């Protein structure tokens, strides 16, 4: 069957359980999540050269575009007003989808600011049939860094996504984990876990891992994140540790602004994607012990 990428809810819910062409190894110590390349035995079906040609044309065109202007990707990815967008607040939107032609393709996590490309994350979907592995490595080499049998995700302008919305506490330096938590690429849902396997959200896992690194100064930076889920986790921390904060009036005003910018946020309840009232959901997590 011809491979055709479609980023739908089923994929979101099953991603933690799938045994697919690429296994992801996530190291929270690095924002450069890697994809390991595996080769299976030869497929019993003959190679469809038309699919290979379609992949080659698409990946070659994308390579040329990226060499000229890394932000000029809307047309080739066929992004328009009909695409499902997640509102992050403060003029930012997120589009998570995919583009593929034959055996392979690219998952993209695109961030728009006032309708313009601000940043993105590209994840390769690489065919594991050994008969075409070398041909596809060459096709992907112009888009993704390849080293030690590993395809690395590609990021555009990620450093801007690591910055707070306001220039708050500029003397505070965040570690690599917390910088990645600031970006939408760590996941923009707010909550704890979900899906068929009950996996902890990536942003929540990082937040827990870095809990000892979070203090009032760092928390205020997190509350100013472009990432809507991270903002709410910052508010959650503040609500649980109010006595540690000195400038509560300013913080409370900012929290009101955050809620007005994003009255509702996406979460998972079991296997179901839900849109919940942001303020009410934070209040629920403030009451939780974990």
Where are these regions (language model features)?
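C-terminal motif of bacterial Sec signal peptides marking the signal peptidase cleavage site
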Residues: 13-16
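Extended repeat-based scaffolds of very large eukaryotic assembly and lipid-transport proteins
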Residues: 22-217, 222-229, 238-241, 248-290
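Bacterial signal peptide processing site
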Residues: 18-20
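Hydrophobic alpha-helical targeting segments used for export or membrane insertion
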Residues: 8-11
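Hydrophobic core positions within HEAT/HEAT-like alpha-solenoid repeats
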Residues: 234-235
């Amino acid at each position: 069957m011809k491979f055709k990428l479609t980023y739908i809810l089923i994929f979101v819910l099953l991603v933690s359980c799938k045994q697919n062409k690429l296994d992801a190894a996530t190291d929270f110590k690095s924002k450069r999540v890697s994809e390991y390349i595996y080769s299976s035995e030869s497929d019993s079906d003959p190679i469809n050269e038309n699919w290979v040609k379609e992949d080659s044309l698409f990946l070659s065109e994308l390579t040329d575009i990226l060499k000229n202007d890394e932000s000029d990707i809307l047309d080739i990815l066929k992004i328009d007003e009909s695409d499902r967008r997640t509102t992050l607040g403060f003029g930012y939107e997120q589009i998570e989808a995919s583009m593929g032609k034959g055996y392979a393709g690219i998952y993209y996590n695109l961030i728009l600011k006032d309708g313009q490309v601000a940043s993105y994350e590209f994840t390769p979907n690489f065919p594991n049939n050994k008969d075409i592995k070398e041909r596809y490595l060459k096709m992907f080499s112009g888009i993704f860094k390849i080293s030690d049998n590993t395809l690395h995700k590609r990021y555009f302008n990620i450093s801007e996504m690591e910055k707070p919305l306001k220039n708050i506490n500029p003397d505070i330096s965040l570690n690599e984990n917390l910088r990645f938590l600031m970006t939408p690429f760590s996941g923009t849902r707010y909550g704890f876990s979900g899906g068929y396997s009950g996996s902890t959200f990536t942003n929540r896992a990082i937040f827990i891992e870095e809990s000892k690194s979070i203090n009032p100064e760092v928390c205020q930076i997190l509350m100013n994140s472009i990432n809507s889920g991270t903002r709410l986790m910052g508010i959650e921390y503040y609500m649980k540790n109010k006595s540690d904060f000195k400038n509560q009036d300013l913080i409370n005003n900012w929290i009101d602004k955050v809620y007005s910018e994003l009255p509702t946020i996406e979460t998972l309840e079991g296997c179901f994607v839900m849109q919940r009232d942001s303020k009410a959901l934070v209040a629920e997590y403030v009451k939780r012990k974990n």
